[in-house]
């Protein structure tokens, strides 16, 4: 099956109200349970991560400018100190649990604009998405909204796992180590583009791999494609990959209603976004001056491995469950090659751009920030692998690899400030755990970021180890004896009946 080819549409079972309810009820339950689990920790997050830090306050300032002034010029908003609305009192209360130090005057993240005034360099999409929740109830309602988006990501993860023949319980069990670990759970509380992008990418990918879509489903795909570039320009390569895997199915649609539902949102976005850039930058694309610089070819390779192995920000250090994607890739190559090529079409261009960034780790934020939007797609190879091995093997392997990630996330929830690291090479959580036992963290894992890098030989050896391990696991997936393609259960009846 080629990259642009989707499965042919088999005969669909009747879409009865009972069948639809049978799918919507478990999905609603998944969303509610995830939201409840996330919401349990909101008080701790809000108390410890106060005031807003990283990029978060700048999205709020843009939202306040839109709400109060109806414009994007934030000159008066900073002059008036609008940020004091989400800052703690001065002096701090005696029971203060938030950040021990922060600037009392928020320095703006200004774009290099050709227009007079002060415009944020951050994408406009997040500010627009949080505008209504923030006006309704400030940070609390905004976090609840983020929790809802994260819960919808969880529901899509489960639906994608079911594509590979798993029942509801099996799909949920496979999704838990992704949903309740870094990076997805960390960014479920933070005003960043990541969790919005994660939902848009997995939904568009999932619908793109189904044989048929209804008009509302095509509209959802179109909205996902339209929103992503407004969250951040770095998502444009992922959008192009999604278009590549969606175009064949769109061209096969016989209904112009369904075609228009998918086409109109991204078409409007494709016109509006360059117009916005022209107004801000005087050119139809964002300014490279708004970034902290870019890597040379050797630095790109270093960043590519650092995204996974860096002690402070590496994905595999914080959630080793993602190692199983390598063996899953081997399984997909043998059983669902089109799915694998579709994942690579979305992921590789995006990863190449992120590795090109000098600050590839996302600076002041939890681990694996730039990998969070792609993290939900890991359920596809994970579920494909789990469908090819004995259940006991899947349970034990997933359990063992999930435990470190769940434990690290528990540590972050107990002390949320430890999600953030100074670029000194030492993981704040690991250092804290060692100190609680009266020990010094021995720094077992390498550092790839340029401010405190490990010796180049150490980084090269770890990179070689990861490359060999990934190749070995992928080869193992290729050699696994087939157990029958349980994924064939994914019929048109399922694809139409599920959102």
Task: Name the predicted role of every residue range.
Residues 206-210, 237-267, 324-336, 380, ...:
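Perimembrane helix-loop-helix junctions
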Residues 156-159, 196-213, 220-225, 241-245, ...:
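Specific aromatic-rich, kink-prone transmembrane helix
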Residues 229, 258-328, 343-357, 375, ...:
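Membrane-lumen/periplasm interface segments of specific transmembrane helices
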Residues 141-165, 198-203:
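Transmembrane-helix motifs of polytopic, lipid-linked glycan transferases
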Residues 1-44, 162, 258-265, 395-400, ...:
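Start-transfer (signal-anchor) and selected internal transmembrane alpha helices
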Residues 63, 174-179, 207, 217-232, ...:
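Membrane-interface alpha helices of multi-pass inner-membrane proteins
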Residues 68-126, 130-134, 290-296, 358:
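Interfacial juxtamembrane loops and adjacent helix segments
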Residues 113-131, 135-155, 172, 186-191, ...:
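Loop-to-helix entry region of an early transmembrane alpha helix in multi-pass inner-membrane enzymes
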């Amino acid at each position: 099956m080629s990259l642009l080819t989707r499965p042919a549409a088999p005969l669909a079972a009747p879409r009865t109200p009972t069948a639809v309810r049978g799918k919507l009820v478990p999905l609603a339950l998944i969303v509610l349970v995830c939201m409840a689990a996330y919401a349990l920790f909101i008080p701790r997050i809000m108390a410890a991560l106060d005031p807003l830090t990283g990029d978060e306050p700048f999205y709020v300032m843009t939202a306040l400018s839109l709400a109060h002034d109806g414009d994007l010029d934030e000159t008066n908003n900073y002059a008036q100190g609008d940020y004091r609305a989400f800052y703690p009192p001065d002096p701090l209360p005696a029971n203060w649990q938030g950040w021990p130090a922060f600037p009392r005057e928020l320095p703006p993240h200004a774009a290099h604009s050709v227009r007079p005034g002060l415009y944020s360099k951050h994408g406009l999409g997040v500010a627009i998405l949080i505008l209504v929740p923030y006006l309704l109830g400030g940070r609390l309602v905004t976090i609840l909204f983020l929790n809802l988006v994260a819960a919808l990501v969880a529901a899509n993860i489960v639906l994608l796992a079911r594509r590979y023949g798993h029942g509801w319980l099996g799909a949920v069990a496979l999704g838990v180590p992704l949903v309740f670990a870094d990076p997805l759970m960390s960014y479920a509380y933070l005003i960043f583009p990541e969790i919005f992008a994660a939902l848009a990418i997995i939904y568009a990918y999932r619908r793109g791999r189904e044989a048929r879509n209804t008009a509302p489903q095509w509209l959802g795909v179109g909205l996902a494609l339209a929103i992503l570039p407004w969250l951040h320009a770095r998502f444009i390569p992922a959008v192009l990959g999604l278009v590549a895997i969606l175009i064949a199915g769109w061209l096969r649609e016989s209904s112009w209603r369904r075609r228009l539902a998918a086409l109109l949102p991204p078409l409007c976005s494709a016109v509006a976004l360059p117009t916005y850039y022209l107004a801000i930058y005087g050119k139809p694309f964002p300014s490279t001056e708004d970034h902290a610089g870019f890597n040379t070819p050797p630095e790109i390779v270093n960043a590519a491995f650092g995204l996974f192995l860096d002690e402070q920000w590496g994905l595999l250090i914080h959630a080793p469950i993602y190692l199983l994607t390598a063996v899953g890739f081997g399984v997909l190559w043998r059983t669902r090659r089109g799915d694998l090529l579709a994942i690579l079409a979305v992921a590789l261009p995006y990863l190449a751009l992120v590795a090109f960034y000098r600050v590839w780790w996302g600076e002041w934020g939890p681990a694996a920030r730039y990998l969070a939007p792609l993290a939900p797609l890991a359920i596809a190879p994970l579920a494909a692998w789990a469908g090819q091995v004995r259940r006991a093997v899947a349970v034990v392997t997933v359990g063992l690899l999930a435990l470190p990630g769940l434990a690290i996330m528990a540590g972050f929830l107990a002390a949320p400030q430890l999600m953030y690291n100074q670029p000194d090479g030492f993981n704040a959580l690991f250092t804290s755990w060692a100190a609680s036992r009266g020990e010094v963290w021995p720094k077992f894992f390498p550092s790839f970021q340029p401010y405190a890098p490990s010796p180049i030989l150490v980084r090269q050896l770890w990179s070689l180890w990861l490359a060999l391990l990934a190749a070995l696991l992928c080869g193992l997936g290729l050699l696994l004896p087939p157990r029958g393609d349980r994924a064939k259960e994914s019929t048109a009846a399922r694809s139409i009946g599920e959102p």
